[in-house]
Amino acid sequence: MNGWFLAAGITALGVAAVHIVGGRRDVVRPLLSCGLADEPKRVLHAVWHMVSIDLVLSGLALLYLSLTDGTPETGLVAWFVAAHFIAYAAAFLVVTLSVGWPRPLLRLPQWILLLPVAALAAAGAA
């Protein structure tokens, strides 16, 4: 068993839970009640669900990798998931830093949850 992948999978599923519970309260509910036109509002709602699914599937994939460590495909899939979470974190950092907010790194702190998954997955793949 690969402990790094196990930790990454558990962390990713924790991130998914925070996204689903916190995101529903802090993002989805306000989005659905705002004055935005219905079509873009529903597209953003669907995108939120897509991210929820993606986070859960990534966590499950990492848990699976923790049990199958040593097979030839394990490293490639783990590096893909690590890159995936790095890209998510980078997207939040770029958006946050481009707005010009004071103390921007704490305004959208999602990157803080995403980077550990990437680091743990990369450590398991190395």
Regions found by a protein language model. Name each.
Residues 59-79, 96-100:
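Juxtamembrane helix-break-helix junctions at the cytosolic face
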Residues 51, 78-92, 111-117:
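Hydrophobic alpha-helical membrane segments
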Residues 7-18, 106-117:
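Alpha-helical transmembrane segments of integral membrane proteins, especially early/N-terminal helices
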Residues 10, 14, 18-26, 36-67, ...:
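Core segments of alpha-helical transmembrane spans in multipass integral membrane proteins
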Residues 2, 74-77, 100-112:
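Non-cytosolic membrane-interface motifs at loop->transmembrane helix junctions
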Residues 3, 64-68, 119-126:
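Juxtamembrane boundary at the C-terminal end of a transmembrane helix
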Residues 90-107, 121-126:
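Membrane-helix boundary connector in multi-pass membrane proteins
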Residues 1-13, 74-81:
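Interfacial segments of alpha-helical transmembrane regions
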